[in-house]
UniProtKB/Swiss-Prot annotation:
The entry's keywords: Acetylcholine receptor inhibiting toxin, Disulfide bond, Ion channel impairing toxin, Neurotoxin, Postsynaptic neurotoxin, Secreted, Signal, Toxin
Family matches, as InterPro entries: Snake_3FTx, Snake_toxin-like_sf, Snake_toxin_con_site, Toxin_cobra-type
Protein localization: Secreted
Principal location: secreted
Protein source organism: Hydrophis hardwickii (Hardwick's spine-bellied seasnake)
Tissues where the protein occurs: Expressed by the venom gland.
CDD domains membership: TFP_snake_toxin
Family note: Belongs to the three-finger toxin family. Long-chain subfamily. Type II alpha-neurotoxin sub-subfamily.
Positions of disulphide bridges: 24-41, 34-62, 47-51, 66-77, 78-83
Taxonomy, superkingdom: Eukaryota
Protein name: Alpha-elapitoxin-Lh2a
Length: 92
């Protein structure tokens, strides 16, 4: 009986710990668990000198809050696992 109770306690602790973490994409379909305190996934996109030939620059990751919007930078934030996909990834 004690073993069963101990097992239930351990499973509960593990499940609570796993439920508190967030995973975000950091690059092309490369996901990572966010550090403690970072509860938002984001995608930043902007044009640089090579935008015409290479497309927009993309930065992805985790943050404590949604990054501040600046001129010429598009930012999208979300708060579920791997929600910060990039539309141009396609289906491959």
């Amino acid at each position: 009986m004690k073993t069963l109770l101990l097992t239930l306690v351990v499973v509960t602790i593990v499940c609570l710990d796993l439920g508190d973490s967030l995973s975000c994409y950091l690059g092309y379909k490369r996901s990572q668990t966010c550090p403690p305190g970072e509860k938002v996934c984001f995608v930043k996109s902007w044009c640089d000198a090579f935008c015409g030939s290479r497309g927009k620059r993309i930065e992805m990751g985790c943050a404590a809050t949604c990054p501040t919007v600046k001129d010429g930078i598009d930012i999208t934030c979300c708060a579920t696992d791997n929600c910060n996909t990039y539309a141009n990834w396609g289906s491959g």
